Amino acid sequence: MEAHTPSAALVPVIDGVVGFRLVHNFGAAWGSFSGMVVVLVIVSIVFCAIILAYMIYVAKEASVLETVGLALIFAGGLGNMIDRLSRGYVVDFVEPLFIDFPNFNIADAGITCGIICVLIAFLIKFFAASKHVEHSE
């Protein structure tokens, strides 16, 4: 079984930049863990539960950026998990044409944007805390 099974012709959206092509992804990112649907669903459930618990019980003082990032990661993980449970694979359809990069979907984009938001929020907190320590000395 291939990790990525293209099942449609390319539909250009922005010529030379991005197009749509239906791909059945039986794995995770870049087709890793292909055919391990049960493992991927379990990992998705665990990560979604951890993020949800963190948002409810720990992140009460979280910034808007951190909250948005965690929500995007949670929603993306949930979306991909629903695909895996209902179809046995994730539906990927966005195909970058300007670089050699695997097809992805909106859930993947949400996860990526969410990780970036959380990292930026962490860096803002880190540098704000280090400035606070610097000024208090």
Each model region followed by its residue ranges:
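Alpha-helical transmembrane bundles and membrane-interface segments of multipass inner-membrane proteins
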Residues: 1-137
